[in-house]
Every structure is written in C-alpha cells, then in structure tokens.
Amino acid sequence: MLENLPYFQRHLPDDLAKVNAVINQAVQSDVALISQIGTYIISAGGKRLRPIITILAGKAVGHDDEKLYSLAAMVEFIHTSTLLHDDVVDESDLRRGRKTANNLFGNAAAVLVGDFLYTRAFQLMVGSGSMRILEVMADATNIIAEGEVMQLMNIGNTDITEEQYVQVIQYKTAKLFEAAAQVGAILGKASPEHEQALKDYGMYVGTAFQIIDDVLDYSGETEEIGKNVGDDLAEGKPTLPLIYLMRNGSEQAANDVRHALENADRRYFEKIHDYVVNSDALPYSISEAKKAVDKAIASLDVLPDSEVKDAMIQLAKESLARVS
C-alpha cells in the first residue's frame, strides 16, 4: 500500500487533504440530488491514483501550488464521471465495496450526475489558465470515450487479439493516467523531453494497472477488489487471461471460454476460473503488466534523481503488489 512507503507517509496525507478540499467544494450544487450523488460516490474513496500522479508529475519538475491540486481534483472528477457512466453501461451493482450510484438512485440520475462531474472538471481546467492543458484533456476524454465504445464493440468477441485488447485498455484506462501526468508536467513548465517522459510514465502505469485489474477478476476477492469477482466474464469482456486461454489453452478450455464469453453468463465463472488459475494465464498476464511497469520506470531515466522520482518508481511497482 502506498501509505506504507516512506515518501507517501510524509506527504500523502497533506497532498490528498488539499485535493479532497477542492473535490468537496466543487462537488456541491444548488441541485440537492447532484450534491447527494456526487458526495456519495466521491466519499467512497478509491485509491486516488490519478490525482497522485498529477501531483507527483508537477513536483517532479519543481512545481507545487494550489493549481496543481485543483488539476488533480479535475482528473479525479473525470475518472469518477466515467465510473458513473460505466456502472450504468455494465449494469453493475457494486463499486469500491458499496452499492453503485445507479443501484441506489437509478440509471438516469447516475448518468446526469456523471455529466455534471465531467463538466465541473472542465471548469477546473479553465482555472489553470492553460490552453495546452485544455487541449490535452479534451483529447484524452475523447479517446477515453472511444475506448469505452471499442470495449462495447468487443463484448463477446472471441476473435480479439492481444494487440486489440491492449489498444482498448490504453484508450479507456491508461489514457487518463497519461493525461494526469502530462497536465502536471505542463503546469510545471517541463521541458519537452521531461513532459514526454512523464506522459509515457502515465501511459505505462495505467496499462499495468488495468491488466492487474483484469487479473484480480480471477484471483481476487470481492472485499479486496471492491466489485463482484467474475463481473468481466458475466459482461462478456475478453480480458487478457481469457485471451491467453483461447490462444494457448487446451481445446476444451478454449472452447469453453469462447462459449462463456459469447453467452456472458456468470454461471460459467467457476469452470472458467478453474481453467484460468490452473494454467499460465495469470502468470502470463502479470508478466505483461510487469513489462509495462518496467517501461514506466525506464521512462523516468531522463529526470534528475529526486525523492519525488523515487516515489514515482515506488508507485509504479505498487501496481504489481496487488497480486503479490
């Protein structure tokens, strides 16, 4: 856990307190239901990884002021808005260990409050006074939406390649990690070389994070991952462990995985889970995540050595610790 690492023990509480202060103020609205739902999902916590990356990227290039924490909150609002929308699309009933907003308040309210958080994020962006930051975030949110549609198109797709899978997760998940790091670098007036390094770092950390998330759907517990295990299979999502089995498993395993994905039924989970854990699907997936982490760390080589750089390396490694 990040809070057990020395740098984060010293700085994380204060940094997150500043971000949460912005979030708690910005989530308020004269429309009571917006404040109620917004506060509900924000107060569920979460790891705040993306805001932390924004803060670290800014500090890595020598920048630390109130605008940095406002941008970090903006990134969290973008993330939270996508969660609200995702839970409606996926018909999820559990998020971060609690009932989803759509489960409690209905789909319409969840979607509309997601829209509110999304537009509030853009108001926070404007406060940065940087057209480049607006440009980066406009591009990122567009690509994230494309990634979500790509994922939707691949529901039940048993012919998906590993390359296509990586493209989907880099669009829908890693792109926001990339943007989170890049806006911190831009605010800190980083050199082009350092901005690119931090941008790459975010992309690779985000890629590793999503692969591990997909691994945990077969190796984690509901209490640990904050959602129902087996959700991906129940939704017909061909994640990396399943793609590996379809390409490298026995004929019986491959056929059963294809059948389970095409029918998107949780009743198949126990059988598919047994195939996954008794094969190399999870070790292979974890090794691919480790490759992404190694690339994230290598991308920081151009930055001068510092306590913040060390913290970013620790954060990248921490994405793998969830399955160790």
Tell where the protein language model's regions lie, with residue ranges.
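All-alpha prenyltransferase/terpene-synthase fold signal
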Residues: 1-324
